[in-house]
Amino acid sequence: MIQPQSRLKVADNTGAKEVMCIRVLGGSNRKFANIGDVIVCSVKDATPGGVVKKGDVVKAVIVRTRKGVRREDGTYIRFDDNAAVLIREDGTPRGTRIFGPVARELRDKDFMKIVSLAPEVL
């Protein structure tokens, strides 16, 4: 569960290393976001010469959470960290590579480009 002020790792090569959630999209009173949800973030740590810089406000989709998510068959999938991938307004990823595993739930939320770039889909 990601909420405003939560910090997440960035799992792509846009140059951002860490972002902080500032808004959960999808309703005026929505408090939490899970895997596959879109959030508005502020870049808190970035590498020099990247696509984004520190202080930029960007949209991101959550690809891994410590909380995990329940699947249809009753199993749970959990990860070791909270991670997001930066996206454009049309939902395509801003980077050209994805690092680490991503959850299969992204396929249901129509983030097929992220799923195809990911090295492992769990």
Swiss-Prot record:
Any one GO molecular-function label of the UniProt entry: large ribosomal subunit rRNA binding
InterPro entries: Ribosomal_uL14, Ribosomal_uL14_bac-type, Ribosomal_uL14_CS, Ribosomal_uL14_sf
Tree of life domain: Bacteria
Gene Ontology BP terms: translation
Keyword rRNA-binding included in the entry's annotation: yes
GO CC terms of this entry: cytosolic large ribosomal subunit
Keywords annotated in UniProt: Ribonucleoprotein, Ribosomal protein, RNA-binding, rRNA-binding
Pfam families: Ribosomal_L14
Keyword set includes RNA-binding: yes
CDD domains reported in the protein's UniProt record: Ribosomal_uL14
UniProt function note: Binds to 23S rRNA. Forms part of two intersubunit bridges in the 70S ribosome.
Family to which this protein belongs: Belongs to the universal ribosomal protein uL14 family.
Subunit structure: Part of the 50S ribosomal subunit. Forms a cluster with proteins L3 and L19. In the 70S ribosome, L14 and L19 interact and together make contacts with the 16S rRNA in bridges B5 and B8.
Protein name per the record: Large ribosomal subunit protein uL14
Protein species of origin: Caldicellulosiruptor bescii (strain ATCC BAA-1888 / DSM 6725 / KCTC 15123 / Z-1320)
